[in-house]
Regions:
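Structural motif
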Residues: 11, 113-114
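Hydrophobic residues in well-ordered beta-strands that form the structural core
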Residues: 14, 45, 77, 142-144
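Short, glycine/serine-rich, charged loops/turns that create anion-binding
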Residues: 19-20, 50, 82, 122, ...
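N-terminal subdomain of nucleotide-sugar transferases
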Residues: 1-71
Length: 153
């Protein structure tokens, strides 16, 4: 009996605050990355519901989590509060909601061989990756983008 290729694939968990169809550059880059690796890895992306503009569509306001498959990539979307780009408190609430929602989803998904995260949002991206690594027992891949130490001040 011949084994399916999917049985041989390593599992990769990818954290992305934004993912397709959001137009944020990080979401587009991570979509290209995920779709480019889907033949080698069984990929699951944990991201927010489409909300780059700050507005959440009505179809994403009913449930806490949404499960989709986009071009053979498993996507788990987390409902987050709407925000205004000029209101820092609303942005912080959005980021914190994603962070804790992503941790809860990660606990439900089980083990992964690799956990991939980026430095967006700053600090929490790395913290989410380390937490995800501990939960899934996977190896952490941390992609640092746009590193600007002066942002801390």
């Amino acid at each position: 009996m011949k084994k399916s290729n999917d049985c041989l694939k390593s599992k990769l968990l990818l954290y992305a605050h934004y993912y397709s169809p959001d137009v944020a550059s990080t979401g587009q880059i991570l979509q290209d990355l995920a779709e480019g690796m889907k033949d080698v890895f069984d990929i699951t992306v944990i991201c927010t519901v489409p909300s780059y503009s700050g507005i959440v569509a009505d179809k994403y306001k009913q449930k806490k989590y949404y499960y989709e498959n986009i071009n053979d990539v498993n996507v788990v979307r987390i409902r987050v509060p709407e925000f205004t780009k000029s209101n820092k408190l609303s942005r912080i609430k959005n980021i914190i909601s994603y962070f804790f929602g992503a941790i809860n989803v990660t606990k439900k998904l089980g083990k992964f061989d690799y956990v991939y995260t980026i430095s967006q949002p700053p600090i929490l991206g790395g913290l989410l990756g380390v937490t995800g690594k501990r939960i899934t027992k996977g190896k952490l891949i941390y992609n640092i983008q746009d590193f600007n130490p002066e942002q801390v001040m």
